Amino acid sequence: RLMRKEIRKHEVQAPIYDPNEEPVMDNNRIRELLPHRYPMQLVDKVIALGANSIVGVKNVTSNEPFFQGHFPQEPVMPGVLLVEAMSQCGGLLVLNQIEDPERWSTYFLKIDDVKFRQKVVPGDTVLFRVELLGPVRHGISSMKGYMFVGDRVVAEASFTAQIVKNK
């Protein structure tokens, strides 16, 4: 019992999401900063953006193209796309740290400690919370991300990105 109580103390809390609130960054602004386009732009909006953290939203619908083959009778969002969406949030966070973010891109160098805890299915709203683990140094940034459906962590990962000036 004591061990479970201690574990609960360290559990990650889900961000509070009110779909009626105006986003901090809408889909159009995301497209200005990230090179991804449909069907690979996986962040619908950003609802919180601070110096060291970001919260993004993905509304998963049954019309997502990946559900045609993953899996037709029991659609599940591929884990690799969850990590990609979280990475896109991380890219937005890092780009927010620099001047003229439209002139830069982020490329991921490393992804570690990925854990999938629950399936993501059509109808789910996924919240991505990404935090910087330290300051951006020499264009390199380390982050930790959590993905939530409701108040449950569905996946998590640590990753490192590099900021590169666009040509």
Predicted feature descriptions by range:
Residues 60-62, 132-134, 149-151, 161-165:
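Beta-strand elements of well-folded, non-transmembrane domains
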Residues 33, 38-77:
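Catalytic strand-loop segment that frames the active site of acyl-thioester-processing enzymes
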Residues 48-51, 116, 159:
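Hydrophobic/anchoring residues in structured secondary elements
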Residues 1-35, 154-167:
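Segments adjacent to and within acyl-thioester-processing domains across lipid
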Residues 46, 77-101:
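Active-site helix/loop of acyl-thioester processing domains in fatty-acid/polyketide metabolism
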Residues 41, 51-55, 125-127, 142, ...:
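Intrinsic-disorder/low-complexity, polar/charged segments enriched in Ser/Thr/Lys/Arg/Asp/Glu/Gln
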Residues 1, 46, 111-150:
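Hydrophobic beta-sheet segments that form the core/acyl-binding groove
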Residues 15-24, 90-129, 154, 161:
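Hydrophobic beta-strand-centered segment that forms part of the acyl-chain substrate-binding groove
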